[in-house]
Curated annotation (Swiss-Prot):
Protein's gene: hutI
Entry binding sites for N-formimidoyl-L-glutamate: 150, 324, 326
Residue sites binding 4-imidazolone-5-propanoate per the record: 87, 150, 183, 250, 327
One Pfam family recorded for the sequence: Amidohydro_1
Record keywords: Cytoplasm, Histidine metabolism, Hydrolase, Iron, Metal-binding, Zinc
Annotated catalysed reactions: 4-imidazolone-5-propanoate + H2O = N-formimidoyl-L-glutamate
Protein name: Imidazolonepropionase
Length: 423
């Protein structure tokens, strides 16, 4: 007997087409079962099909979804989840046209977050991150990547990673940990970036032994770390058994996309300034292009990543919030879906695949997350929507009704749902 049977699902978005990364037309294809049903037993999906095919199945709990849509839990593959403080005091300065470097000189910018993170205890960081994780869950996210990077020293980086490890044990959302010690060059290492990178590399053996990070990341950008420094750093991390990511070409076409493809990074992230050659190399690689349009939007920039071109050229594109206190303070992955549709010229189908299938591969979870398939864990979202296009179309709010994590209800809107409303 099943534990739970979901029936009367108007659109069941299984996302279950070919295995592996989705490109080109596959990104624009959504496997949908009309009038679907899903069976769950011991936290695992044991039945996927039509309501007609589900007749005769017995379950301890039968949930009538009222003709609404069900999808896999969403995957957010790029966040800076664990940090201290906030930076709302900088908004007025930015609106007045104060340059970022001047804000830095006043102790603001990333330095403000670094200082606040250093001052916070591990438990304070954990409790703050739980608040943000709860919000992510309420937007339908069941798997998330979380980076360190607000320490720029060994003690605080360890603290962030240990906070992430505690969150992995205490919160229902699955968390994939990334070490981003090479987020910036500290003032005391100005002009000595290679020495700083060596310091960060020296932390990796113990980090691997304690299993505090699965990925290593670096910020490859003008004035931070060069392409050659980034490649050398990440290749050494790979030699130690880590998978790697790269903050690439966020501002300038520096060659970060090319470097990511060349070294076999799991993902290259941002890519606003990626060159034509970089896009071509990504298309011919297994590196996911994780685009972060919410950051471009919040920074009030005119030029967004060329998502349409990337998909047309054959790049496997994912979307993420880039949740962080400075350049994208939002946990709302649904808002990112809307911005991607409007500013990256992605179709609703491409957007959905970019927050499920491809985003799961960006963090090496393609075999466990992002699809509704028999044998996979029951990470599911019931939406207050009757078709998939409605979610990115009606922007700025959450359309989530209920989230199941490993077959258990982890979030529900409860009586506030407009279940009887007509769209």
């Amino acid at each position: 007997m099943l534990d739970t049977l979901l029936i009367n699902i108007g659109q069941l978005l299984t996302m279950d087409q070919e295995d592996g990364l989705l490109r080109r037309e596959a990104m624009n294809t959504l496997p949908v079962i009309e009038n679907g049903a899903v069976g769950i037993e011991n936290g695992v999906i044991t039945f996927v099909g039509t309501a007609e095919e589900a007749k005769g199945l017995q379950a301890r709990e039968v949930i009538d979804c009222g003709g609404k849509m069900v999808s896999p839990g969403l995957v957010d593959p790029h966040t800076h989840l664990v940090f201290g403080g906030s930076r709302e005091n900088e908004i007025a300065l930015k609106l007045q046209g104060v340059p970022y470097l001047e804000i830095l000189e006043q102790g603001g910018g990333i330095l403000a977050t670094v200082n606040a993170t250093k001052q916070a205890s591990k438990e304070e960081l954990v409790q703050k991150a739980k608040f943000h994780l709860d919000r992510m869950l309420s937007f339908g996210v069941t798997t998330v990547e979380a980076k360190s990077g607000y320490g720029l020293d060994d003690e605080t980086e360890w603290k962030q990673l240990e906070a992430t490890a505690q969150l992995q044990k205490e919160h229902p959302v699955d968390i994939v940990s990334t070490f981003l010690g090479a987020h910036a060059v500290p003032k005391e290492y100005k002009g000595r970036s290679k020495e700083f990178l060596q310091w960060m590399l020296d932390l990796l053996p113990e980090m691997k032994e304690k299993q505090l990070a699965e990925f290593v990341d670096i910020f490859c950008e003008t004035g931070v770390f060069s392409v050659e420094e980034s490649k050398e750093f990440l290749l050494k991390a790979k030699e130690l058994g880590f998978d790697v990511k790269i903050h690439a070409d966020e501002i300038d076409p520096l060659g970060g996309a090319e470097a990511a493809a060349e070294i076999g990074a799991a993902s290259a992230d941002h890519l606003v300034g990626a060159s034509d050659k970089g896009i071509e190399m990504l298309a011919n690689s297994n590196t996911v292009a994780t685009l972060l349009p919410g950051t471009t939007f919040y920074l009030n920039k005119e030029s967004f990543a060329r998502g349409r071109k990337m998909i047309d050229e054959g790049v496997a594109v994912a979307l993420a919030t880039d949740f962080n206190p400075g350049s994208c303070p939002t946990e709302n992955i649904q808002l990112i879906m809307s911005i991607a549709m409007l500013k990256l010229k992605m179709t609703p189908e491409e957007v959905w695949n970019a927050v499920t299938v491809n985003s799961s591969y960006a963090i090496n979870r393609g075999d466990v997350a992002g699809k509704i398939r028999v044998g996979r864990k029951a990470d599911l979202v019931l939406w207050d929507a009757y078709n998939y296009a409605y979610v990115p179309y009606h922007y700025g709010v959450s359309h989530v009704n209920t989230v199941w994590k490993n077959g258990n209800i982890a979030y529900t809107r409860g009586e506030q749902s407009w279940s009887t409303a007509t769209i």
